[in-house]
């Protein structure tokens, strides 16, 4: 790995934030087109653009950090601030969903039967699949911490093992969540309960998929000897993101599954 000890910002401007924003616009517009006009063309274009952006952005980060040595201290500091601000924006994103849920559940209107859950809604049992999902995510939080400590101690094999376990637990969580959606006795169209439940848990599920992808890239990089005990911010950012996903799920479980049922 090339290392430069001077304090200069070496990374050149990147086009990928712009293409990433455009792909997000295409995906959200495509989702609306799919819902209202049953056309998936724009959505597929958005997904393709997003995947190409992800691939090329990660490729450039690997080249700049590992092969060119451009991740000097100011660059690493900028990346840390960027990740912190990104996670902060995600906190506010989920705050909106919790606000919608509590606004509706703390003072249910007469149209909902003046109680929560609304009349006609059979909520999911919080002690069944949701509790298993909670256990799976908490276990993944332990394994990602194990991976981080192994990397700090230059224990390559244990780091790979722990990271693989985390990814598999993330995949298992996603499959459990999908099976829960298929078996749920209500849909996203069933009033405010259905919409807040599926939007909040669905967006969390999307974040689990994104986090699993992030960790998979880290696993590939670790297999290629890209990380050292002193230079591994890519993995650190993924670990921060994964812990954020864990914490959000705990709030979702307590609020929507346990208290809300």
Swiss-Prot record:
It comes from the Eukaryota. Gene3D superfamilies: 1.10.287.70, Cytochrome c oxidase, subunit III, four-helix bundle. Residues 1-15, 67-72, 153-155, 224-232 are mitochondrial matrix. Residues 35-40, 106-128, 184-190, 257-261 are mitochondrial intermembrane. One of its GO terms (biological process) is mitochondrial electron transport, cytochrome c to oxygen. It is a multi-pass membrane protein. It catalyses: 4 Fe(II)-[cytochrome c] + O2 + 8 H(+)(in) = 4 Fe(III)-[cytochrome c] + 2 H2O + 4 H(+)(out). GO terms for cellular component: mitochondrial inner membrane; mitochondrion; respiratory chain complex IV. It is an enzyme of class 7 (translocase). SUPFAM superfamilies: Cytochrome c oxidase subunit III-like (SSF81452). The chain crosses the membrane at residues 16-34, 41-66, 73-105, 129-152, 156-183, 191-223, 233-256. It is found in: Mitochondrion inner membrane. Keywords: Membrane, Mitochondrion, Mitochondrion inner membrane, Translocase, Transmembrane, Transmembrane helix. Component of the cytochrome c oxidase (complex IV, CIV), a multisubunit enzyme composed of 14 subunits. The complex is composed of a catalytic core of 3 subunits MT-CO1, MT-CO2 and MT-CO3, encoded in the mitochondrial DNA, and 11 supernumerary subunits COX4I, COX5A, COX5B, COX6A, COX6B, COX6C, COX7A, COX7B, COX7C, COX8 and NDUFA4, which are encoded in the nuclear genome. Component of the cytochrome c oxidase, the last enzyme in the mitochondrial electron transport chain which drives oxidative phosphorylation. The respiratory chain contains 3 multisubunit complexes succinate dehydrogenase (complex II, CII), ubiquinol-cytochrome c oxidoreductase (cytochrome b-c1 complex, complex III, CIII) and cytochrome c oxidase (complex IV, CIV), that cooperate to transfer electrons derived from NADH and succinate to molecular oxygen, creating an electrochemical gradient over the inner membrane that drives transmembrane transport and the ATP synthase. Belongs to the cytochrome c oxidase subunit 3 family. This is Cytochrome c oxidase subunit 3. It comes from Gorilla gorilla gorilla.
């Amino acid at each position: 790995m090339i290392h430069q000890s001077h304090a200069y910002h070496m990374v050149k401007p990147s086009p990928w934030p712009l293409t990433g924003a455009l792909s997000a616009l295409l995906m959200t517009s495509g989702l609306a087109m799919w819902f209202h006009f049953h056309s998936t063309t724009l959505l597929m274009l958005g997904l393709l653009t997003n995947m190409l952006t992800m691939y090329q952005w990660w490729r450039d980060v690997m080249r700049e950090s590992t092969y060119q040595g451009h991740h000097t201290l100011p660059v690493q500091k900028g990346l840390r601030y960027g990740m912190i601000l990104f996670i902060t924006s995600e906190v506010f994103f989920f705050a909106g969903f919790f606000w919608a849920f509590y606004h509706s559940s703390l003072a249910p209107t007469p149209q909902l039967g003046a109680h929560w859950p609304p009349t006609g809604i059979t909520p999911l049992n919080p002690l069944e699949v949701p509790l298993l999902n909670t256990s799976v995510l908490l276990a993944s939080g332990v394994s990602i911490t194990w991976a981080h400590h192994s990397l700090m101690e230059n224990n390559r094999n244990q780091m790979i093992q722990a990271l693989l376990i985390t990814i598999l637990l993330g995949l298992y969580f996603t499959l459990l969540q999908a099976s829960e959606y298929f078996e749920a006795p209500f849909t996203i169209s069933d009033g405010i309960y259905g919409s807040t439940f599926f939007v909040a848990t669905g967006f969390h599920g999307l974040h689990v998929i994104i986090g699993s992808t992030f960790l998979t890239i880290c696993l590939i990089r670790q297999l290629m000897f890209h990380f050292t005990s002193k230079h591994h911010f890519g993995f650190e950012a993924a670990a921060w993101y994964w812990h954020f996903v864990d914490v959000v799920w705990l709030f979702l479980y307590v609020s929507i599954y346990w208290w809300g049922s």
